[in-house]
């Protein structure tokens, strides 16, 4: 991990420190940073819960202990950094108290683990008491609900912050294989030579989850799969898979290339999209009985530029599918049917598969000859085995935010472009197709790939059933 050069933060202020994200992710990431001696500032929590610092420390330990074996010395160092302010974040008087607690800190990082509707009010209140002059502000997705709301949110943030002060957190951008994509593509000539329309015939991106909306019914019913994962996670991954090489190492160099991809994509065609909903979804607490919210979405898109013109890209994501897996699959073009080949029949196309979750890794599928038939051979690499223990996404993102490294965060123009791309599907969502839990989604999704390779069974870790 690199220092972004903007100066390290001397205070971390977490709005919503008693919330679900802090319990599941943030405290664990802070603990791991402390363990690796990468945490070097006080932590001030802000939330509406009336609790003491001692109660916050106890709650933090319980949160970390859910997934980590706690080293008392490490935790004691982390606990010593914690302080707490309780109050209503919409009350301007809270920010006077906050200013007193911040004191002489000159480069705070404000991490807003709050509902998106509170982002702008919090930032505007911070500006009113002059707490933003050298600060950075991290905001969690979703960044808006549609194109219009994203434009409004960005305008309100930019009225009091420079773009270099805003960190838009999408945890997918902190995942090891997503970070590695740039290096895999451009540092390996064997891959770089194949990575265009001349060698690749189509691209599939799958994000499957083997669970439902659980206790998030009310939230999810207002969002759906398109907003929840496609507009952000999967389009960001698509950009990294297809972008041109950056001309330098800065965050803007990387984000410029991602933005070029988005600009080359037309708004999605509702006729090339299939929406699904698993049976039983409307029985979940918080979900409307007549809900037409999608828990599954599959779509086709293309990138109209020199490298990718004519290459179809298929994206699917859904809940209550047979397995939990996220992967990118690239199909290479077939070799011709030549006389020496078995039965003069060409082999199946080679495939390059990048598994993002779980057990990140890379697979090259090639063909071999056995007797008078073809056989697929899989050349597999596990990043955990070959590269060592991965840095967890929130650990990576928190550290990047603290040192001012913007490479792992989404930029304003990319957010607006991705909303532009999906907006037609929000305006004209179309029919909802029901599907059984444990299936790979509605049958109608197969029609998107007519004349192409069809949805493939994902590459699952050894011993995983689907």
From Swiss-Prot:
It catalyses: D-glucose 6-phosphate + NADP(+) = 6-phospho-D-glucono-1,5-lactone + NADPH + H(+). Keywords: Carbohydrate metabolism, Glucose metabolism, NADP, Oxidoreductase. Substrate binds at residues 171, 175, 209, 228, 319, 324. InterPro entries: G6P_DH (IPR001282), G6P_DH_AS (IPR019796), G6P_DH_C (IPR022675), G6P_DH_NAD-bd (IPR022674), NAD(P)-bd_dom_sf (IPR036291). It is an enzyme of class 1 (oxidoreductase). NADP(+) binds at residues 48, 88-89, 141. Belongs to the glucose-6-phosphate dehydrogenase family. This is Glucose-6-phosphate 1-dehydrogenase 1. It comes from Mycobacterium tuberculosis (strain CDC 1551 / Oshkosh).
């Amino acid at each position: 991990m690199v220092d972004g050069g903007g100066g390290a933060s001397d205070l971390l202020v977490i709005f919503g420190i008693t919330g679900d994200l802090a319990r599941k992710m943030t405290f664990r990431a802070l603990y791991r940073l402390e363990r690796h001696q990468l945490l070097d500032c006080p932590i001030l929590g802000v939330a509406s819960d009336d609790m003491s610092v001692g109660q916050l420390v106890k709650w933090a330990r319980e949160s970390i202990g859910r997934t980590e074996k706690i080293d008392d010395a490490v935790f004691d160092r982390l606990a010593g950094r914690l302080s707490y302010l309780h109050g209503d974040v919409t009350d301007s008087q809270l920010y006077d108290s906050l200013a007193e607690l911040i004191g002489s800190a000159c480069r705070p990082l404000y991490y807003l683990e709050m509902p998106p509707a509170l982002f702008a009010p919090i930032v505007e209140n911070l500006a009113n008491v002059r707490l933003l002059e050298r600060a950075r502000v991290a905001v969690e997705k979703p960044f808006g609900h549609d194109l219009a709301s994203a434009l409004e949110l960005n305008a309100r943030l930019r009225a009091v912050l420079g773009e270099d002060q805003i960190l838009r957190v999408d945890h997918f951008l902190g995942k090891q294989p997503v970070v590695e994509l740039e290096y895999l593509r451009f540092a390996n000539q064997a891959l770089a030579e194949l990575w265009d329309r001349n060698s690749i015939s189509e691209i599939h991106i799958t994000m499957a989850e083997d669970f439902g909306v659980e206790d998030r019914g009310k939230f999810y019913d207002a969002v759906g799969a398109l907003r929840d994962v496609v507009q952000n996670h999967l389009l960001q991954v698509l950009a990294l898979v297809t972008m041109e090489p950056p001309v330098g190492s800065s965050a803007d160099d990387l984000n410029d290339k991602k933005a070029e991809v988005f600009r080359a994509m037309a708004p999605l065609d509702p006729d090339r999209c299939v929406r699904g909903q698993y049976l039983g979804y409307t029985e979940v607490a918080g979900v409307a009985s007549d809900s037409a919210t999608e828990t599954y979405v599959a779509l086709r898109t293309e990138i109209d530029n020199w490298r990718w013109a004519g290459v179809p890209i298929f994206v699917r994501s859904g809940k209550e599918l047979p397995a939990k897996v996220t992967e990118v699959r690239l199909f290479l073009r077939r070799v011709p049917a030549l006389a020496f080949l078995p039965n003069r029949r060409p082999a199946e196309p080679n495939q390059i598969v990048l598994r993002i979750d779980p057990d990140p890794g890379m697979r090259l599928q090639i063909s071999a000859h056995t007797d008078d038939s073809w056989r697929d051979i899989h050349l597999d690499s596990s990043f955990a085995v070959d590269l060592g223990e991965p840095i967890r996404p929130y650990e990576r993102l928190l550290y990047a935010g603290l040192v001012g490294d913007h490479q792992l965060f989404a930029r304003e123009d990319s957010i607006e472009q991705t909303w532009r791309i999906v907006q037609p599907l929000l305006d004209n969502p179309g029919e909802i197709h029901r599907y059984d839990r444990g299936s790979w989604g509605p049958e109608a999704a197969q029609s998107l790939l007519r004349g192409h390779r069809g949805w493939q069974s994902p590459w699952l870790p050894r011993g995983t059933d689907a």
